[in-house]
Design a protein with these regions (language model features):
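N-terminal "cap/leader" segments of large eukaryotic alpha-helical scaffolds
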Residues: 1-49, 160-163, 167-170, 174-181, ...
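Core helices of alpha-solenoid repeat scaffolds
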Residues: 4-8, 35-43, 75-87, 101, ...
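Helix-loop junctions that connect tandem helical modules in alpha-solenoid scaffolds
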Residues: 11-18, 42-51, 86-97, 123-136, ...
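Hydrophobic residues within the alpha-helices of tandem HEAT/HEAT-like
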Residues: 30-34, 62-70, 105-113, 136-148, ...
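Alpha-helical repeat/alpha-solenoid scaffolds of the HEAT/ARM/MIF4G superfamily
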Residues: 72-189, 351, 355, 359-477, ...
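Extended alpha-helical scaffolding segments
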Residues: 82, 100, 316-363, 367-393, ...
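Alpha-solenoid helical-repeat scaffolds
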Residues: 178-185, 201, 205, 209-219, ...
């Protein structure tokens, strides 16, 4: 269809109003039209004032796209004409529609940047009149945003950066002049709407210029923090004025406050602001004065003022950013090193942040500020520890600060009534409590064992179930820090509290899951105690195991998880209660949930593994018979999803029996008759392989008495359903039994050939199978190289298949194939030699763009191995260099972007590099970018720089 105005208007109408299928076609056609050369002409026709807003917006968007993507289509002599048209369009749409005006301003910004921002002031002069002031602000605001988002070549970016650095001083001065009206006297009446709007626009513009990140951060004089303090004070004053008159200001007052605080955050943190501690302290003191007024407003829990909470959220975000950027100055101020008024103000700001963390009410029902501070506590404790650096003690003042924080976290962990929470609120609260758990560990890094003392005190002082549950939640968060081998009394006291709650589930139903979490989390600590303390710990652990078992009917998932952890880490009490645990595991009512049942089976396995064999074997037999019966029943049923639950239960039990190979062997022997039925059903083959894999992992060399049956099951299952789990079983058979069992040869050959036949039709369709196959072959080549003789008849086909897998899009299969070919090059070059030229060609195709660039590292390892290989059967002069040269010889290969100079540089660097994978990866990376036409772009510069940093 021709790109006429009429056709384009019709397509836009279909896109906005048609059916889904028609809209998709219209979108495709309209997108193609944006790239057409005719677009430079039809955009102006579609932008006429008589056209609809949707059509005007499409035209403005097309203009922006053309300037970004098709700038090379504009001859230099047409730049002036395009500039005039852009300015006329921007001025013509000064009164809207707003979305069209904004898009035209962005287009003008892109035009300016495509010319390296030269003559910036001259280009924008027509917008400098009072009536066009808002347009000028809009264009100035989007220029830095467009600069950050645009893809441009390195030279053009450097040119733009220099021009923007030069212009930024004037722009920020202009914004400051606009914001300084906040210093006027507003004691009798509030600022009018026009003034408020001007503050919003000026703050947005200044923030945009300050927020150019990284290497592109503006480095003019106005970007040093001391010189930005005047701007910061103007922004703070604007917020203070608007907050003072909040009841009489327009609805845009909060938006203006948020814009000012966003700009203030940028001014406080960008441009190496942390190099100026004195200015930072002054800034934090000013922020404290502002926050003191806003944050001290009482928070009404019954009727939350969400408009005010939006302002508080913006202010807290700003304060947190300033404190995180200037943490060192803040630490010194709190410790009294900076004793002037500014230092006191910074210390006051920290107290206000603690108060915000302890905001009354429940998150997210009554407030949304307390979740903004968690990153500050991490940064603060990290700076305190770095400054101490093991050479000096932490200042005692931090004990008080982090004690306050810990108490606040305990309070904020309290959960509201479930009826008050929507599903979304429940998820927010779950994430919030996880953040609280992390912050508790920050407290531990400063307070150490005192954390348990503070938490125990909070539990003792609690007068509601919710408060006690919150203390237990914090106690559970500290479990990873429990001192193994030591017995702090407050820790034991809290664990006793958790035990009492778990032992009386009806009395504390809401606290029960948290109490059970405590029992399980401290299981490893209980198991670490010895001597007199160990005796007390063993008794306590036994009580914990009994309590977890008794709580199963009331909180099955939490109790089962706690029981599993306790049985795994506290062997003596688990062994003593093994019979009870096995009985509970067989209880159908408790075991209905599959996840819970797996936890119970794992707990039973750990308890049996800790017991004497004569006592454990009969108990295990009852479990094994039950599982075998379930597997048999599922194998005889017609349900397609059958068997998975029983098989996963077998896996859980077998994994827990790993410390007792004799019991693992008993279990496998009992399961073998049922397992023999599974290869007859394709959907049960993979569950069978999972059981065999975990059985071999638990038994290791002790699998030999049953290896014949395992091998037969593996071959039978793999013939019916080749899958990755089956190849994992083959790998374990070879590793554990290859030297003692002659049948390993047949099992390996049968399964490898079956996998190769499956992949030969379409390797990309089964990436997981390809990954597993070449992971198996890599393990055989490296650990059991003689086993390659077993598959020698198909080795050539496997090599050719691996060459195809090198360029599949799924990274797992490609990476495994490259790894095996590299190992083969080091150990069996004669097997790889016939395919080497084709492999070199495939590698070039892949580097050139036939596969994702994420696979370049695996290809680099392969090229390095090929270059190091000793090609004993190669003709004179043959090797990686000749094969790569032959592959690169055709013009335009692998892409038209790869010039002869690029190819020669790549070839030379690859051939000479035989030792450093890092240097070879840089060469491959650079050639890959060249093949994609990206070699001189900003993206290429950042990519190569990132590789250098990682190296």
């Amino acid at each position: 269809m021709e790109y006429t105005a009429q056709n384009l208007e019709y397509a836009v109408s279909v896109f906005y109003n048609g059916e889904q299928a028609e809209r998709t076609k219209a979108h495709t056609w309209l997108t193609t039209a944006q790239r057409a050369p005719e677009a430079w002409n039809f955009v102006w026709e579609l932008m006429q004032p008589t056209k609809g807003t949707e059509i005007q917006f499409y035209a403005a968007t097309t203009l922006h796209t053309k300037i970004l993507r098709c700038w090379n289509e504009v001859p230099e002599e047409s730049y002036e004409e395009l500039k005039q048209k852009l300015l006329q369009a921007v001025i013509g749409y000064a009164k809207g529609p707003i979305i069209v005006t904004n898009r035209l301003c962005i287009s003008l910004a892109a035009f300016i940047l495509q010319q390296g921002s030269k003559d910036l002031a001259e280009i924008l002069r027509p917008l400098s009149t009072p009536e066009n002031a808002s347009l000028l602000l809009e264009v100035l605001t989007v220029i830095p945003e467009e600069y950050t988002s645009m893809t441009m070549r390195t030279a053009l970016r450097s040119k733009n950066r220099a021009a923007l650095n030069q212009a930024s001083h004037m722009v920020l001065d202009d914004m400051l002049r606009c914001l300084q009206t906040a210093f006027n006297d507003y004691s009798k009446e509030p600022p009018n709407k026009a003034t408020i709007l001007s503050w919003t626009n000026a703050a947005n513009c200044a923030a945009s210029w300050l927020n150019i990140d990284g290497e592109d951060s503006l480095e003019c004089g106005a970007t040093t923090l001391p010189e930005r303090l005047t701007l910061c004070r103007a922004l703070q004053t604007a917020v203070h004025v608007l907050y003072t008159w909040s009841s009489q200001c327009s609805d845009g007052a909060v938006e203006t406050c948020e814009a000012c605080l966003l700009c203030l955050r940028a001014a406080a943190t960008t441009g190496a602001a942390d190099r100026y501690p004195a200015a930072a302290l002054q800034l934090m003191a000013d922020l404290a004065a502002l926050a003191d007024r806003v944050l001290q407003t009482p928070l009404d829990i019954d009727t939350p003022d969400w408009i005010n909470e939006e302002l508080v959220t913006a202010l807290v975000t700003c304060c947190v950013a300033a404190c995180e950027c200037h943490t060192r100055a803040l630490v010194l101020a709190v410790e009294g090193v900076e004793s002037d008024a500014a230092g006191g103000g910074a210390a006051r700001l920290l107290q206000l942040m603690l108060a915000a963390q302890a905001a009354p009410g429940h998150y997210p029902l009554h407030e949304t500020r307390s979740n903004l501070l968690f990153s500050l506590w991490y940064t603060l404790q990290d700076e305190i520890l770095n400054m101490a650096d093991g050479k000096s003690k932490i200042n005692p003042i931090w004990q008080d600060v982090f004690t306050q924080l810990l108490l606040a976290l305990i309070k904020k962990s309290e959960m509201p009534a479930e009826s008050a929470l929507s599903r979304d609120d429940q998820e927010l609260l779950r994430c919030y409590r996880q953040d609280v758990s992390d912050a508790v560990m920050y407290c531990f890094s400063i307070l150490g064992d005192r954390c348990w003392e503070v938490t125990a005190g909070a539990y003792a002082a609690a007068n509601t179930e919710a408060a006690r549950e919150a203390a237990l939640h914090v106690f559970a968060s500290l479990a990873d820090a429990a001192p193994h081998g030591r017995y702090p009394p407050p820790l034991a006291e809290l664990l006793q509290h958790a035990l009492r709650v778990a032992a009386t589930p009806q009395a504390n139903p809401r606290a029960l899951p948290t109490a059970l979490e405590c029992l399980g989390s401290y299981a490893s600590w209980l198991g670490s105690l010895e001597g007199e303390e160990g005796g007390a710990a063993a008794a306590l652990a036994g009580a914990c195991v009994r309590a977890a078992g008794a709580a199963l009917p009331h909180s099955p998932a939490a109790a089962a998880l706690a029981l599993r952890k306790l049985c795994a880490d506290c062997s003596a009490p688990a062994a003593a209660l093994a019979a009870d645990i096995v009985f509970v595991t067989q209880n159908a009512d408790v075991g209905r949930d599959l996840w819970t049942r797996r936890q119970l089976l794992s707990a039973a396995g750990a308890a049996l593994a800790a017991s004497e064999l004569t006592r454990a074997a009969p108990l295990l037999r009852t479990l094994a018979d039950q599982l075998a019966a379930e597997l048999t029943q599922k194998a005889n049923s017609s349900g397609r999803g059958a068997g998975c639950g029983a098989a996963k239960g077998c896996v859980a039990l077998m994994g827990a029996l790993a410390p007792a190979p004799a019991l693992a062997a008993h279990l496998l022997r009992a399961l073998l008759p049922a397992l023999a039925l599974l290869p007859q059903h394709q959907h049960l083959v993979e569950p069978m392989f999972n059981i065999l894999k975990h059985s071999l992992s638990s038994l290791m060399a002790d699998c030999l008495p049953m290896i014949n049956e395992i091998g037969e099951l593996t071959v039978a299952g793999f013939k019916l359903h080749p899958c990755p789990a089956g190849l994992d079983v083959v790998k374990l058979i070879v590793l554990f039994a290859a030297d003692e069992w002659g049948g390993a040869c047949d099992v390996t050959r049968e399964c490898v050939c079956a996998a190769a036949r499956t992949l030969a039709t379409d390797a990309a369709a089964a990436p997981d199978l390809a990954d597993a196959l070449y992971t198996l072959l890599l393990a055989l080549t490296r650990k059991k190289p003689h086993t390659l003789d077993w598959i020698d008849p198909v080795l050539h086909d496997l090599v050719n298949l691996a060459c195809e897998c090198v360029r599949v899009w799924e990274s797992g299969g490609a990476r495994a194939a490259c790894g095996w070919l590299a190992a083969l090059a080091a150990r069996r070059t004669n097997a790889l030699r016939p395919a080497a030229p084709a492999l070199a060609h495939q590698a070039i195709c892949t580097i050139g763009g036939a596969a994702p660039r994420a696979q370049l590292e695996a290809l680099t390892e392969l090229l390095l191995a090929l270059n190091r290989a000793q090609w004993t059967e190669a003709k004179e002069g043959e090797g990686l260099g000749s094969w790569l040269a032959a592959a690169l010889a055709p013009p335009g290969f692998p892409t038209a972007h790869a010039t002869p100079a690029h190819k020669n540089k790549f070839l030379t660097n690859v051939i000479k590099e035989r030792s450093s994978k890092r240097r070879l990866l840089e060469t491959v990376q650079e050639f890959s970018l060249a093949c994609r036409g990206l070699i001189d772009t900003e993206y290429a510069r950042q990519t190569l720089a990132a590789k250098s940093i990682v190296a």
